[in-house]
Amino acid sequence: MVEQTVVREHIKARVMSLVRSAEPSSYRNPKLYTLNENGNNNGVSSAQIFDPDRSKNPCLTDDSYPSQSYEKYFLDSPTDEFVQHPIGSGASVSSFGSLDSFPYQSRPVLGCSMEFQLPLDSTSTSSTRLLGDYQAVSYSPSMDVVEEFDDEQMRSKIQELERALLGDEDDKMVGIDNLMEIDSEWSYQNESEQHQDSPKESSSADSNSHVSSKEVVSQATPKQILISCARALSEGKLEEALSMVNELRQIVSIQGDPSQRIAAYMVEGLAARMAASGKFIYRALKCKEPPSDERLAAMQVLFEVCPCFKFGFLAANGAILEAIKGEEEVHIIDFDINQGNQYMTLIRSIAELPGKRPRLRLTGIDDPESVQRSIGGLRIIGLRLEQLAEDNGVSFKFKAMPSKTSIVSPSTLGCKPGETLIVNFAFQLHHMPDESVTTVNQRDELLHMVKSLNPKLVTVVEQDVNTNTSPFFPRFIEAYEYYSAVFESLDMTLPRESQERMNVERQCLARDIVNIVACEGEERIERYEAAGKWRARMMMAGFNPKPMSAKVTNNIQNLIKQQYCNKYKLKEEMGELHFCWEEKSLIVASAWR
């Protein structure tokens, strides 16, 4: 107990920012990577398809993130804004620490100049409870963390029933052998333990063992140390995990190769998990958003340089265009239009339709809990879309409906008789808590409510990975494999020292990674599910699959062949389109009726 207290105090002292910019010494390999294997970059931009005339779009600029203004924005954030833990009166720890205390010899660029009142104050009354496969500190004085027995029993029964219906057997904790193929990369911890535990017959043998152990550590890759650290943490070995966190911070860089970049973000997720500060970091990263144009540009860059996300939008738009062909009045309901990128493309596509064009009405749910934009930001996005529609001769009206997604009802959506109704879910459903979080299954309730609207078409675009119900360690493995593919794909499209690339990784990827790794329960917002689970949920809600047409599939396939390297792949399974980096499925798009 004393040892764990010391470790926790050490963790508290080392909590720092999730995101940093590296000094020149952190550069590992400044080699520039092109988009395709031929070594040229003339096929880099997808702007011709996604945004044919970038110069006419007031939301985009060629230099979306001038370094000076970007750093000034974050470093000038007010210091009187705080996110404090509700319990404890211990010393506040700056989320970014002093400039001299940063690992990787780095300096803070991203942050909110906030301080966290960490839940590791030695003066606080705490108890340890088991959450999944790890031990976390819970605070009972003013936090209702213990539920009534009857509620817990009811939740268990509901989960058991829905698990049987949804086929959750794959979510059970399994050995690492069943998660992935074991190779030498994953043997770091075992080799280290063997060296440490081997009998010492003489002082010479002791010396050799010590040298051998050092060699193992020095030769270990960031991936090996990350996995060993996550395993140690899942087993409650805090001191071992902390040691590996410190080791990782010396060898990773947000400007290094993909393995170093993803390790830089995931190690901070592990540190936040040990410090129970994941939810505070998550809040801090959305406490003060950049100016609207910059945020929009960051999302736009992500869709251009990691095109699997854009392919998902294009597939949904293709299905929508086919569904509204010949219709006069079309009403699209979108529960999170993000930054409106999908509808920029859709409006231009409608403008190119032959004959009479439909009149389009778009209702966007402006959820105050959304992590994609500031409250009220949807109105600004709507104005941009209306201007774009006017410029392209498309009849278009936009309505931002401020409401929590969980309480939206048919009566509030303003559906009218005679109009063709389309519902679009793009990277939104995974934010809704399901039966594994609460007895009120908001994820399935939303789908049933949408079914009651009798839409002509429902489109779903989601990440194809399970970070929802799996326990911590297998979830960590899945998240690493998934985001490794994302970071590797970015390595083919933007140079490693690119300011745009670092902004994309910070604003669009890092926050999700930390939330997946560090948080549990209702605090874990990023709850992706695999394609099969989404399929089961849609069918349980009463929807029938509508396979993507050959035209939609062929159009995207041709786009990939013409403008992207052959590592981007499109696979069709059960009428759904899977967009992959090499053999790893990243995004899945499907249509339902």
UniProtKB/Swiss-Prot annotation:
Tissue: Expressed in seedlings, roots, shoots, leaves, flowers and siliques.
Motif (VHIID): 330-334
Biased composition (Low complexity): 202-211
Domain (GRAS) ranges: 213-593
Principal place of residence: nucleus
Biased composition regions of type Polar residues, renumbered to the chain: 35-48
Single GO molecular function: transcription cis-regulatory region binding
Disordered: region residues: 29-61, 188-216
Domain of life: Eukaryota
VHIID, as annotated region: 299-364
Region (PFYRE), start-end ranges: 421-515
Any Gene Ontology biological process: regulation of DNA-templated transcription
Pfam family, one: GRAS
Compartment list: Nucleus
Region SAW: start-end pairs: 518-593
Keywords attached to this entry: Nucleus, Transcription, Transcription regulation
PROSITE patterns: GRAS (PS50985)
Region (Leucine repeat I (LRI)): 220-280
Leucine repeat II (LRII) as annotated region, ranges: 380-411
Gene Ontology CC entries for this record: nucleus
Function: Probable transcription factor involved in plant development.
Family of this protein: Belongs to the GRAS family.
Name of the protein in question: Scarecrow-like protein 1
Species assigned in the record: Arabidopsis thaliana (Mouse-ear cress)
Gene: SCL1
